[in-house]
């Protein structure tokens, strides 16, 4: 960005990462967080234009750097509503029989809280945690250890296509207990399927569900 400005080329910084990336748990050891934070500062100072995904991040740039940005939110495809078939055959799931989390299995998604809270709830519903590990398998193993002994908690692994459609289409509730987000695609998708959504009280989720 510095060199581009020196040579009088316009620079548009597209901050489409999910949230303020340097705050993520995976960057807190070593120099990762400082390096990414410096990149954020450079974007605010030197880019000709900055694009953000959420009003929360837009407010952050205004309050932190006095920088005006352009808000261009995520969008999703029209949903394919499907009856439970594949998910019944593979996981024994039926319509309204489970609470769904679907997303990357990373610490900032709040899945630890979800598992711990669910284990204390008396319900016949299952908790379906759908998604793959983003960086390493260590967090996935931590979650499975946390869920050990509760047969209601199901890990599906990465899903796509008709399987993903069925999970969204037949969930009793979709939940996203994140600590940190940009504009969560999985929440937008869940809402497009008409799901009742239970989300954490952070601006990036609140501005999507509104009420």
Which stretches of residues belong to each language-model region?
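A conserved mid-protein helix/loop that constitutes part of the nucleotide-sugar donor-binding site
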Residues: 97, 101, 106-120, 141
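Short alpha-helical donor nucleotide-sugar binding micro-motif in glycosyltransferases
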Residues: 158-159, 166-171
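Short hydrophobic beta-strand element within catalytic cores of glycosyltransferases
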Residues: 196-199
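Membrane-proximal helix-turn-helix segments that form the acceptor-binding/catalytic region
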Residues: 31-50
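Short, structured helix-loop element that forms part of the nucleotide-activated donor/catalytic region
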Residues: 59, 123-152, 156, 163
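Carbohydrate-associated surface elements
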Residues: 56, 75
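Aromatic "clamp/platform" in nucleotide-sugar-dependent glycosyltransferases that forms part
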Residues: 179
């Amino acid at each position: 960005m510095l060199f581009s400005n020196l040579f009088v080329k316009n620079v548009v910084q597209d901050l489409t990462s999910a949230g303020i990336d340097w705050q993520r748990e995976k960057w807190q050891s070593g120099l990762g967080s400082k390096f990414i934070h410096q990149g954020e500062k450079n974007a605010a100072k030197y880019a000709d234009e900055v694009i953000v995904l959420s009003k929360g991040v837009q407010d952050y740039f205004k309050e932190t750097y006095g920088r005006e940005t352009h808000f261009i939110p995520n969008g999703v495809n029209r949903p394919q509503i499907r009856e439970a078939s594949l998910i019944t055959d593979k996981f024994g799931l039926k319509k309204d029989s489970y609470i769904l989390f679907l997303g990357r299995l990373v610490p900032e998604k709040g899945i630890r809280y979800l598992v711990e809270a669910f284990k204390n709830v008396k319900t016949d519903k299952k908790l379906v945690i759908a998604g793959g590990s983003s960086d390493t398998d260590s967090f996935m193993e931590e979650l499975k250890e946390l869920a050990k002994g509760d047969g209601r908690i199901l890990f599906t692994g990465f899903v796509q296509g008709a399987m993903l459609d069925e999970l969204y289409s037949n969930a009793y509730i979709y939940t996203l207990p994140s600590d940190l987000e940009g504009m969560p695609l999985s929440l937008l998708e869940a809402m497009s399927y008409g799901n009742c959504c239970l989300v954490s009280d952070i601006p990036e989720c609140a501005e999507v569900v509104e009420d």
